[in-house]
C-alpha cells in the first residue's frame, strides 16, 4: 500500500523549469500539468528548423515517458476561477496569463507547490499557492 504524498512533498513544475537546462534538483513528488505538454507541443510545431523540431520532440517524448501529466479536470477548473479572480483583484487581467494560471490551478487543486523560473508571472497568487522560484 503506497502512501499519499503530503502537501509539503507535492510539487508541480512550470514549463519554464522543464525547458531550463540549468535547474538544480528539486525535492518532492514532482508532477507536470497537461498545460505544460500543450506548451511544449506548440514549441515543437512552430520550430524554425527540422533540427530544432527534432530536439524539442525528443525532449517532449522523454518528458512524457517520465511524467504522467495531471489533467485539467473540474477541480483544476474551480481552482482556475479562484486564481483568475485573485489576479483581477490585483488590477491585472488573467487573459494574457491563461496558460500560467492553468498550471498554477493544477498545483492549487492538488495542494502542491509550484516551481517556476518566472515568479512574476504568478504575482498576486502568493496567498493561495506556494510559488518557489528556481
Predicted regions, residues:
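PIN-domain endoribonuclease scaffold, especially VapC-family toxins
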Residues: 2-11, 21-105, 113, 123-134
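Short, glycine/acidic-enriched loop or turn micro-motifs at the edges of active sites
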Residues: 17
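Flexible glycine-rich beta->alpha loop in the catalytic core of nucleotide-sugar glycosyltransferases
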Residues: 120
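Conserved acidic donor-binding loop of glycosyltransferase catalytic domains
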Residues: 117
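Conserved catalytic-loop position in the HRD/HxD motif
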Residues: 14
